[in-house]
Amino acid sequence: MITLTPGHLTLPQLRRIAREPVQLKLDPASFAKIDAGAKAVADIAAKGEPAYGINTGFGRLASTHIPHDQLELLQKNLVLSHAVGVGEPMARSSVRLLLALKLSSLGRGHSGIRREVMDALITLFNADVLPLIPVKGSVGASGDLAPLAHMSAVLLGVGEVFIRGERASALDGLRVAGLAPLTLQAKEGLALLNGTQASTALALDNMFAIEDLYRTALVAGALSVDAAAGSVKPFDARIHELRGHQGQIDAAASYRELLEGSPINQSHRDCDKVQDPYSLRCQPQVMGACLDQMRHAADVLLVEANAVSDNPLIFPDTGEVLSGGNFHAEPVAFAADNLALAAAEIGALAERRIALLIDATLSGLPPFLVKDGGVNSGFMIAHVTAAALASENKTLAHPASVDSLPTSANQEDHVSMATFAARKLADIADNTKHILAIELLAAAQGVDLRAPYHTSPKLAPVMETIRGKVAHYELDHYFAPDIAVIAKLVGERAFAKVAPFSFASEQ
C-alpha cells in the first residue's frame, strides 16, 4: 500500500505504482483542503456570478454563461464531447501512473472537486479496474483533454475499462468495483479533464524503461570492451574529474567497477595499441551526457507529477478563482524530448560497438564473429538490424516540442505536443532494447573467442545469463529467436541489475 500525499510524490513511489501491483490510499491530511476547495466552488456556483469553468462554456465559448440548472449537464457534456481519443489503449502501467498523478493534483485542494469523486478513482485503481484510454488525441494544452476525458467517462458509466486485464464496459467495471455512476457537480468535469497527467504518466513510464536500458547499456558496453580487447585506461577517474560533468564521472566509475579484475584486460595491457575507437574510449563522455539529460528530465517530471495543472485554480482562503496556464505541458514536452535524445544516443553508441566487434580489422576477432566466414555470415545481418533500429531512432528523436498547431478557434494558439513527445519514447526504448540485445550477443561471442581468457568477475554472471539462453554461435542458424530471448531478458532488467549504479527512482 502506498499513501499518496498530494504534492509529495517520490520517484520510487511512482516507479512502484507503474511496475508493481501496489494499492493506493490518500493521505487523510489532505481531506480538509479537498473539502475546502469543493465548498468554495459550490458557493461560487450558488451565487451565480460568472466564473470560468464553473458556470461558463469552455475554450472559445468561455464567455457563454450557463444557468445554474444546467451546471451538471455542462460537466457531463464536457466529458462526453471531449472523449475523442483514437489509437491503441494506453499501457496499463501508464494508466496506473495517470490515475495516481490525477489524484495527487486534485488532492491539493485547488481544483474544487468532491472527495466522493476522488474516492471513486481510488476504488477503481485498487480493484484493478482501469479505464481504457486511447493513446492518441492530445496536443498537451489545454492539458491532456481527450485522454483524461476517457478516464472521466468511466466514472459516468460510459466507455470501456480493463477489469484485471480483460476488456469490458465501464458499467461492468463500476459494478465489479462496487460503484455506481457519478453525477458530476460544478467544475468537476473540467477538474478531471484539465491537467498534464497523461503526458506526464507516459513520460515517467517510458523514463523508467529508459533508465533500465541505460544500466543495461553500461553492462553491454563494458562487455564489448573486453570482447574487443579494449583498454580500461580511458576510464581512469582523473580524466573525468578534470572535465567535471557528474554524469561522466559516474559513468566512468561504473565501467571501472564492471571491468575490474578482467583476465582478458590483463592479458593485453602491454600491447602496442595506443587508442581505442571512440565507441569504446568515449563511453563515459557519451553515456555521461545521456545520464545528465536523464537526471534533469527526472527532476522536471517529478515537479510536474506533484503539480496542480488544472485551470482555473481555486483558492479557498480568499474565494478567488484564477485562470492561468498550468495545463500547458511544455516542461513535460522538453523533458520527454531530452529523454528521446538520450535513449536514441544509447542505442546509437551500442550500434557502433556492434559494428566495431564484427570488423576484424578493428576488433582482431574473426570477421562477423564467426569461424569459417563465407559459408557462414555470422553477425553480419544482425548488425544491419541494429543499424536500421538506430537510424529509426534518429528520426523518432526529432523534438516534438518544436511543433505547435492552434486549436479551439485560435483561443488555444500554442500547444506543447507533450503527449506525442512522451508517447514516442516507447518506440525509441523498444528499438534500443533490441540494439542492446544484439550487442550483448555480439559481445558474448567476442568474449568466448578470447578464450582461454575470461571477462571480469562482475561481468561473468552476464555471460552465464546469456549462455543459459543462447549457445555460442558456431554455424549459421535461425537467428531471430536468439535476439528475441535476450531482448526479453533486457526488458526484465536481467542485465540492468548487474550495473553498479542506480537512479533516484530505484532508491
UniProtKB/Swiss-Prot annotation:
The residues joined by the cross-link 5-imidazolinone (Ala-Gly) are: A141-G143
Reaction it catalyzes = L-histidine = trans-urocanate + NH4(+)
What's its EC?
Answer: 4.3.1.3
Q: Which domain of life is it from?
A: Bacteria
UniProt-annotated location(s): Cytoplasm
Which InterPro entries does UniProt cross-reference here? Answer: Aromatic_Lyase, Fumarase/histidase_N, HutH, L-Aspartase-like, Phe/His_NH3-lyase_AS
List of residues that carry 2,3-didehydroalanine (Ser): S142
Q: How is it modified after translation?
A: Contains an active site 4-methylidene-imidazol-5-one (MIO), which is formed autocatalytically by cyclization and dehydration of residues Ala-Ser-Gly.
The metabolic or biological pathway listed in the UniProt record of this protein is: Amino-acid degradation; L-histidine degradation into L-glutamate; N-formimidoyl-L-glutamate from L-histidine: step 1/3
Q: What is this protein called?
A: Histidine ammonia-lyase
Q: Which gene encodes it?
A: hutH
